[in-house]
Amino acid sequence: MKTITRLALVFTTAIFSQAAFANDCTVDVEAGDALSFSTPKIEIPASCANATINFKHTGRLPAAAMGHNWVLAKTADLQPIQNDGNVAGAAGGYLKADDPRVIAATAIIGGGESTSVTFATAGLDAGDAYSFFCTVMSHSVVMKGTFALKG
């Protein structure tokens, strides 16, 4: 009986550990009408082949009035991406089309909406500095945070 109990415990622990590990590759981020992300820092284990960001707009205002997106790039590229996003404007989704500096980006969403983006981490270097930010109407001035691979 003890052997069965031990095996059940090992099996249960293995299943829950794998589930927890898989969830480390997915991060939930929120933003509202107050021009801020719910977290200033995102860390993804370096062992994740892909990372997923689930992005939710918790505010009430529509995308045309207070929309947000979630964009990931090297920190050094943040301002140039924002500058090009300003040129693209609302019609271009506040991002230059097919910008190779953008690692990942969500659609622009408004209050009550959600979106997600999944991207490969293989091209990311743990030694580089990365930032996530919102390019809508230069929100990146205050809406930004750091992104890192850990481990």
Model-assigned labels for residue ranges:
Residues 8-10, 20:
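Cleavable N-terminal signal peptides
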